[in-house]
């Protein structure tokens, strides 16, 4: 279960204490991860663009008897979202930004939303995943009341892909309705993310892969960045760390 993996990774890297537990989950969707964070003892706020998703999230939190605030909003503007000890952004949601300028803008918004020494964790597709694994990917599911077609293609920009999804859902009268979705994603080289994080103000960050506390390999599918907005740092050590990925 991916949500188990996201939760376990988060708990290893978010230093929650009695006085330090306010968490903002970006792109929270239907609130599955938000509920898990709340059950783990965090004071959770979930933010998402979709009002429909947030309605489901509110019902999910209520059913789980968890007090969670949900905000309809865009991660490109967190000026009204408040201040937090921790911010997370999972399920490669950063990859939905249009370009690296927007990625950098998100990082700046998160930095400003964090309390001092706050931690920001996000995951993105690796360039191996977008360049070698996804292009030509095809998945079809056919059940009695539901069918799904999922095809992925390489897009024009470097390290970018397009997911084309078609759903057929059986209605009460027995007929099937068709729903089409197109998802465009793009990732970047590790050094690009490093530079954008530094420009946003983050001076301390570490890189992991595939939900484990290990450095990425050439075939890692998902990169995890754990960034902290500490004010004082050893600039030489930071420079050497960044250079190790160049």
Per-segment meaning from a language model:
Residues 2-20:
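Conserved alpha-helix/loop element of class I SAM-dependent methyltransferases that forms part
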Residues 19-29:
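Conserved class I S-adenosyl-L-methionine
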Residues 31-77:
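Class I SAM-dependent methyltransferase SAM/SAH-binding core
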Residues 79-86:
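A short acidic, Gly/Pro-enriched loop at the edge of an enzyme's catalytic core
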Residues 90-92:
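Residues lining the SAM
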Residues 104-116:
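A short glycine-rich, Lys/Arg-flanked "PGG" loop and its adjoining helix->strand segment in the class I
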Residues 121-192:
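SAM-dependent methyltransferase
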Residues 184-241:
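C-terminal lobe and adjacent flexible extensions of AdoMet/dcAdoMet transferase-like proteins
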């Amino acid at each position: 279960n991916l949500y188990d993996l996201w939760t376990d990774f988060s708990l290893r890297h978010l230093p929650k204490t009695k006085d330090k537990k306010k968490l903002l989950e970006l792109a929270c969707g239907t609130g599955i991860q938000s509920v898990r964070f709340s059950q783990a003892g965090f004071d959770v706020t979930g933010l998402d663009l979709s009002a429909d998703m947030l309605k489901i999230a509110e019902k999910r939190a209520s059913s789980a008897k968890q007090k969670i605030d949900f905000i309809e909003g865009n991660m490109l503007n967190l000026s009204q979202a408040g201040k937090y000890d921790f911010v997370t952004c999972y399920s490669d949601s950063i990859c939905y930004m249009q370009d690296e300028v927007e990625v950098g803008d998100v990082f700046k918004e998160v930095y400003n939303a964090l309390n001092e020494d706050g931690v920001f964790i996000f995951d993105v597709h690796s360039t191996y995943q977008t360049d070698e694994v996804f292009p030509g990917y095809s998945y079809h599911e056919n059940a009695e009341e539901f069918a799904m077609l999922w095809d992925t293609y390489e897009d024009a920009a470097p390290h970018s892909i397009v997911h084309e999804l078609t759903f057929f859902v059986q209605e009460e009268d027995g007929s099937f309705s068709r729903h089409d979705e197109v998802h465009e994603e793009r990732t970047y080289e590790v050094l690009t993310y490093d530079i954008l994080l530094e420009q946003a103000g983050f001076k301390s960050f570490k890189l992991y892969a595939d939900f484990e506390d290990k450095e990425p390999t050439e075939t890692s599918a998902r990169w995890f960045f754990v960034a902290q907005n500490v004010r004082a740092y050893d600039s030489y050590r930071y420079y050497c760390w960044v250079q190790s990925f160049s």
